[in-house]
Amino acid sequence: MSPLDVHVNRSPIAGKITRMEHRTGKGKRRGPFLPAFRKESEYNERVRTLFQREDGLIVEVMQISGALARTIIPWTSEGDDMRRGERFGMIRLGSRVDVRVPAAKFEPCIISAEDGDKNHPKGEFVKAGSTIIYRGI
C-alpha cells in the first residue's frame, strides 16, 4: 500500500479472533524500518491475528508496518466476534497486509498486486470489504 491508500484492515471471514500477537520492530529507536514490500521488512513492527470460523477453519492476517509511520493500531482484542468485512485495525501510511488461508481449502482470486492476469491487471486496487481475494474449493 502506498501512503495515499486507505489503511483500514477488515476481517477476511466471519468468526472469532482467537489470537493476536504484536511484535515491535527491531533496530535503534524503533528502526531502521524498511518498505513493507521488501523481504527485509520481516524486522518491521507487525501484528499477527488469527480468525476462526465456527467450523474450525483458521485464517491468519499479518499487518506489517512500513518505513514511514511504523504504527499498527488494532481496534479489536482476542475473543472478539467479527463479521466478514468488519474493520479490525489500521496501519498508518506505507504498509503491507498478508492473508494466509489453508491451501487445500481455498484458491486465490488475486495473487499479488504485482502479479497481473486478465481479470485483475497489475496495480489493481482492492475495494474495501467487497473485493474477493480467495474462493473456497
Q: What are the residue ranges of the model-derived segments?
A:
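Contiguous, well-folded functional domains in the mature portion of proteins
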Residues: 1-137
